[in-house]
Every structure is written in structure tokens, then in C-alpha cells.
């Protein structure tokens, strides 16, 4: 339901939708809490306070995955306009990938000697050039900046160690709801 409502929200606000994300999330959080608290009180017989605590935990788990999809929706028009493709690390971890996605996977693998790992890549943007994917950017989408601020720079440093991956842009996308990032003046 959140994704469906976000698509309607994006239709309403168009290219300016990203500027109103906090407004969207606040409204969604309120709807989610009201429904979840009522559901937990009725189904599990919890007090309102106990249900509120569980509802908050449930919201955090729910919104994390939804945020990735919302960012994808926000950038899909841009990607179409510039003939870019999108995938993610969950897709790339699957077996028997189509050739194009297998090439994307191989283009971002970080070599640790005896093994290789995929960097944290909630959204991977690439362009097909002469039948081969050129990785443009890896986006790490985090609902909360706290305690995760080192993951994205770590992967960028690892990608810099190879001539093949050194030019890949690595970015973290966050609504920074905890106001952990300094604000520009």
C-alpha cells in the first residue's frame, strides 16, 4: 500500500516529489501506527503502550525496504531519459542470472584475494555500451544515518583499489530523519 500511495504522491507532485518526502513519510507513519497499534491490541491483547513499542519496531522494518523502492521510483524517469538501467544487490546474488546482469555483477565484485564480495548496493545504475554494462553508480539507501555512515565510504575505498571499479560513483541516500548530517547554510 505504501508504494501504491507513493506512486500517487509522485503523480501529484511530479519532479518536486523528492522535496516533500518527509511530508509523505510522516503521513504514512501516522497511518501505519494507528492501524498497527489497533491490530496488536485486538489480536494480541497488548496495552496501548506495548502495542506502540511493537508498532514502532514494525515500522522501522517496513520502511527500510520500502525506501529503496521509493528511491527507485524517484530516479526511474531520469534513468529512462538517459537510457540507464537499474538493478540491485539482491538480484545480483541470485543464481543463473541473465548474461547482462551477470556482467553487471562481475563489474562490481570486490576482490579480497581468496574470495570476492558484492558491495552494499541497494540500487545499481548502469549503462549498456557496445553490449557491455558500464557501472555508473552504486546507491546505498539507508532510512537512518546513525551507525551506518561508515559502510558506504568503506565500499568506495574498496572499489578504488581496482582499475576496473575505481570510477564507479558510490552514494548514500538517506532522508536523515535523525538529523545526523550537517545542514548547508
Question: Where on the chain are the PLM-derived regions?
Answer:
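Acidic-basic catalytic patches of nuclease active cores, encompassing PD-(D/E)XK
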Residues: 45-109
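Conserved catalytic cores of phosphodiester-cleaving nucleases, focusing on short active-site segments
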Residues: 123-125, 136-143, 152
Amino acid at each position: 500500500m505504501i508504494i501504491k500511495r507513493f506512486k500517487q504522491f509522485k503523480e501529484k507532485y511530479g519532479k518536486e516529489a523528492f522535496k516533500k518526502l518527509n511530508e509523505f513519510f510522516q503521513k504514512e507513519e501516522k497511518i501505519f501506527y494507528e492501524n498497527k497499534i489497533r491490530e496488536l491490541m485486538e489480536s494480541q491483547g497488548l496495552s496501548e503502550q506495548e502495542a506502540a513499542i511493537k508498532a514502532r519496531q514494525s515500522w522501522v522494518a517496513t520502511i527500510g525496504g520500502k525506501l529503496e523502492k521509493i528511491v527507485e521510483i524517484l530516479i526511474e524517469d531520469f534513468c529512462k531519459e538517459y537510457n540507464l538501467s537499474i538493478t540491485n544487490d539482491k538480484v545480483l546474488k541470485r543464481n543463473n542470472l541473465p548474461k547482462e546482469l551477470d556482467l553487471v555483477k562481475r563489474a562490481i565484485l570486490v576482490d579480497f584475494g581468496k574470495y570476492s564480495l558484492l558491495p552494499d548496493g541497494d540500487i545499481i545504475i548502469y549503462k549498456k555500451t557496445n553490449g557491455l554494462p558500464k557501472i555508473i553508480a552504486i546507491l546505498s539507501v539507508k532510512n537512518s544515518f546513525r551507525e551506518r555512515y561508515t559502510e558506504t565510504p568503506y565500499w568506495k575505498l574498496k572499489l578504488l583499489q581496482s582499475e576496473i571499479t575505481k570510477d564507479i560513483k558510490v552514494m548514500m541516500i538517506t532522508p536523515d530523519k535523525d538529523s545526523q548530517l550537517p545542514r548547508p547554510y
